[in-house]
Amino acid sequence: SYADAEFFTKLPEIEDKIDVVTYVAAEGDISTDLMSPGAEAHSRADRELHGKSFISEKAQKEIQALKLQHPGKRLMLIAEKGTMGVGSSRMSGINNVALWMGEQASPYVPFVNIAPIVAGTNGISPIFQTTVGVTGGIGVDLKNWVKKVDSDGNAIINNDGSPVLEEKYSVATGTTLTIDTKAKKLLNEDGTEELADVSKAFSPQSIEFMKAGGSYAIDFGKKLQIFAAETLGVEPKPVFAPAKVVSHPGQGLTAVEKIFNNNAVGVPEGTVLHAGSDAMVKVNIVGSQDTTGPMTVQELEAMAATVISPVLDGAYQSGCHTASVWDNKAQANTPKLMAFMNKFGLVTGRDPKGVYPAMTDVIHKVLNDITVDDRAIIIGGDSHTRMSKGVAFGADSGTVALALALGMANITVPESVKVTFKGKMADHMDFRDVVHATQAQMLAQFDGENVFQGRIIEVHIGTLLADQAFTFTDWTAEMKAKASICISNNETLIESLEIAKSRIQIMIDKGMEIPSGMLQGLIDKADKRIAQIRSGEQPALRPDDNAKYHAEVVVDLDQINEPMIADPDVNNIDVAKRYTHDTIRPISYYGGNKKVDLGFVGSCMVHKGDLNIVAQMFRNLEKANGKIEFNAPLV
């Protein structure tokens, strides 16, 4: 029975038609923080308690009322004129959506729900889409607003230079729609009109997740079937959807395609994977974040996993998020988390024995330091898991648990957008201005369309050291990119690896090494990689000249002659565009009259160099205007 995967084949198929009722949570992009507020992070592992923080009390009452008005129909949470789930993967966010709008996983397990339906005019953020799959949910790209055109077919432009949108069909709260899962179409209530193609939401793999109640069941089901078949000495029955293989003979490989081909598991010899292929890949580095860590622990316990996968090069449990609010709840939860993860086989930011001092550096900064191969795949429990070496994917707590337990992950090879630079950066400009200018120039080159969304940003800045490259790659999370890759030259990569070695050595000197010798192993791997580069055996990762890209963006550095500011356009006539960071302006736009209500320097996307710049600005101001007084709680 197990060798035939009857545990899966005997499950009921998903419904042919799903009747849904819409609930618009907000206009514009919806952050996962709306579904699971960061301020309530301490309760994420307690689903009943954390569920009370979902959106607002008012929204919860409206959702309950819709359920009563439409018995037998499922609710669909919508980001009107925006993207659903930006900012992070946030497993607790999709858990909350499922709790309020999904279906109970088992009558014997309270507050654990699955199968939520979420949607956005511009689809689902890539990092959140994975989390939707974990719960066997459906993520719908509505496309219900389109560019308005004049009689000549040209886009009509808004007061901020972006295209004016017009409504193609309504999804106002309380609208009844039908999802045809066989035809993969979104229909009006009586099924007479096709509103949108939703085939992206119903790939063969996604349908399996829906049928099984989540992606983990499929991952472990496959392992169970293979184990049973090997035990019996028979071939496993072909039950699960075959992995999609996209291969174009004669076509070169982008950087991410090279990394995936290097790390792919179970691919027939000689098969080359291009964008669109489904791949099981070996993971090199895994990071667990401290506010989602308790949920990762729950997942590991549910998997009966007791020790870290031996195929991983490195794994780290951070203590950064709770460090800034070291309250009673954090003090109660964090030591237990560190003790579990340390015993499981991770290097931990806090010492369960209390010997070495706490290392509260931001998780992605540490992961950047312990990544010692430009061909590595990194999985991290934080949306800003973006490295200057290798390719890194932010992931939900469950995917992190899978990577820790199995040392592998299922990922579709993403398309890439190539970003190159021309001209020279002025001496008085900061690299942050290049980051902002990239966004502004990309939007200008593609008529306001964000071509980065859901794709890899392949950045060609060969001489950029790890910390600067990290500033760029970290920002790509804000542009809804799937991930990013920095293409270095040989000398720069060697220098970045030497920096990584020195920082790992500091961790060893502090006493953070674990019995497996993981940190020393990373230094040894860095030495090996440096030797490969110096000998010419394996130079720094580069794409092939004949690689195919979804788009190419050229950033003109000569155009950047003054600081750039990302400033929400709160007066935009389109409500959905008032609170996004897509409006980039030069500082001269404000004429020196911009009022600043609050200043904060210290996000995960800055480093000490940025703080030095701010300090110098204040010194200059003090020289001109006298002493500056601070009135901030964290200074």
Task: Give short role names for the model-derived ranges.
Residues S1-V635:
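Fe-S-dependent hydro-lyases/dehydratases of central metabolism
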